[in-house]
Amino acid sequence: MGANGTLVECKRGESDAVVFRFLIFDAPSPSSVTAYVKLMQKYNVRHIVRACGQTYSAEAFEKQGMVVHGWSFDDGAPPTQTVIDNWLNLLEQEKNKSPPETIAVHCVAGLGRAPILVALALVEYGGMPPLDAVGYVRGRRKGAINQVQLNWLMRYKPRHQEGNEGSLSCAGCAVM
């Protein structure tokens, strides 16, 4: 059984320096874990964020040196405050890595919970307006992010403002 995902690279401003890579994918099943381990290895993934209930054992990924973070929240809903805090803490930890490691994010179908976390990262660290971030993600993952999640992101107040010391620009984002 094959595995695939959508890789989103975020570059710092006008430069070619990649700040974050996100690999959005659907949840592995017990029979497809091996294919997903290979996919994660291909993109040098070290962190996997599981934004849904557990559908597979993390052991195969952990044996390859990957950390699986279980940060589940309700299907179709925006992330909880705990998930937001955990996600942003992970991004803070990874933002200055050179070269940046890919952060993989999945939910059941890779269309709701995982994409909204990536859109949140684009708003927080890329300084992208929420609609632009959602449009950017939807342009790469058809059907991603529902109206409830979009409305939440539109009301979200970023912790990192563009122009602040910790702010990054994703104006040069590219999908590979």
Swiss-Prot record:
Signal peptide: none annotated. Substrate binds at residues 109-113. InterPro entries: Prot-tyrosine_phosphatase-like, PTP, PTP-SAK. Residues 174-176 form a propeptide. It is an enzyme of class 3 (hydrolase). It is found in: Flagellar pocket. The modification Cysteine methyl ester is found at residue 173. Belongs to the protein-tyrosine phosphatase family. This is Protein tyrosine phosphatase PRL-1. It comes from Trypanosoma cruzi (strain CL Brener).
